[in-house]
């Protein structure tokens, strides 16, 4: 049986600290699109690390609110998920504490992708 996880969020909230967000049910302002990407080659950190990069360029800009849709999650292989999250457990602390050098902390394939992505907005 899958757990049903629901939060009772009544009003939007934010923080002046960097905080993760994922790519699901996320609304982005047009001007931030060049800075946010779901990054390949970083396992399950693809959207989370992308959110940290966005906040490097736009600090104090994230607002959380209740979901506007309900997501019926597909069946997951928890061991595979864990294996794909290890990169985050090992590297996220360093990643967010050295955001001015975020490109150096990405795998080479992710660096190439992000540079190509940014060029599309020049």
Which residues does each PLM region occupy?
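C-terminal catalytic/acceptor-binding lobe
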Residues: 2-122
